[in-house]
């Protein structure tokens, strides 16, 4: 399960950014995952729940946005979404397409409560 190592790095980044912002705690993390990123949301959530204990990210809500896969034909330049004929260009019927979107996995935003807010 590679989600464990992915989530460990994700948490390190989140905690570092939150501490840099002098946050009291992290309340929400918005993540973007491409259709072909190979990341399982439920596994990331489970790993995050366990790994974030005793950190300022404990209890934070993870929100996921999905980016659909998109391809570009290397023969004619046409861009197209994934479909039944995965890598076949619908324009020229060529079999030489590259993925131009859908492999992403990144933190879009982190919502925090800062130290200046009273308890």
From Swiss-Prot:
MF terms in GO: nickel cation binding; zinc ion binding
Family annotation (PROSITE patterns): HYPA
Family matches, as InterPro entries: Hydgase_Ni_incorp_HypA/HybF_CS, HypA/HybF
The entry's keywords: Metal-binding, Nickel, Zinc
Pfam families given in the database record: HypA (PF01155)
Metal-binding among keywords: yes
Function according to Swiss-Prot or TrEMBL: Involved in the maturation of [NiFe] hydrogenases. Required for nickel insertion into the metal center of the hydrogenase.
UniProt xrefs under HAMAP family: HypA_HybF
Family indicated by similarity: Belongs to the HypA/HybF family.
The protein's name in its UniProt record: Hydrogenase maturation factor HypA
Species of provenance: Dehalococcoides mccartyi (strain ATCC BAA-2100 / JCM 16839 / KCTC 5957 / BAV1)
């Amino acid at each position: 399960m590679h989600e464990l190592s992915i989530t460990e790095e994700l948490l390190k980044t989140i905690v570092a950014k939150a501490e840099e912002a002098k946050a009291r705690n992290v309340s929400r993390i918005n993540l973007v995952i491409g259709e072909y990123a190979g990341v399982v949301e439920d596994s990331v959530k489970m790993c995050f729940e366990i790994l974030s204990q005793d950190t300022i990210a404990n209890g934070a809500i993870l929100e996921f946005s999905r980016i659909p896969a998109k391809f570009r034909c290397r023969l004619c330049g046409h861009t197209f979404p994934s479909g039944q004929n995965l890598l076949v260009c619908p324009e020229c019927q060529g079999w030489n397409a590259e993925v131009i979107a859908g492999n992403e996995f990144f933190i879009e935003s982190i919502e925090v409560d800062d130290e200046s807010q009273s308890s």
